[in-house]
């Protein structure tokens, strides 16, 4: 009869820390692997799970069609004509800060369709 995974886990759980270290070293030698590589691979998904939830939309440049960009900025921000024009002419400038990813991507798409150069941070 073969040993189950649960039996192995119980046996390892009952071992002292020094015994576990020796077991890991023996497994590294037996299979020609390093536990450090496994730790680095395991750490990768943890970083991916910490996804950013708030984004800033930055107008980098107005582009050739400044009037269309001003209209898009007015529609997205609710600013008046003069304020939107001043914002577009002062590029690079932050249009919106702390917005969701979906809102940031939608705003970026609308401004790029109007001819602006936009960055989402």
From Swiss-Prot:
Region named Required for recruitment of EF-Tu and EF-G, and for EF-Tu and EF-G-promoted GTP hydrolysis: 54-121
Instruction: State any GO CC term.
Output: cytosolic large ribosomal subunit
Output the PTM entry: Acetylation of Ser-2 converts L12 to L7. Lys-82 was found to be 50% monomethylated.
Q: Which residues carry this modification: N-acetylserine?
A: 2
Coiled-coil stretches: none
Q: Which residues carry this modification: N6-methyllysine?
A: 82
List the protein's name.
Large ribosomal subunit protein bL12
Species assigned in the record: Escherichia coli (strain K12)
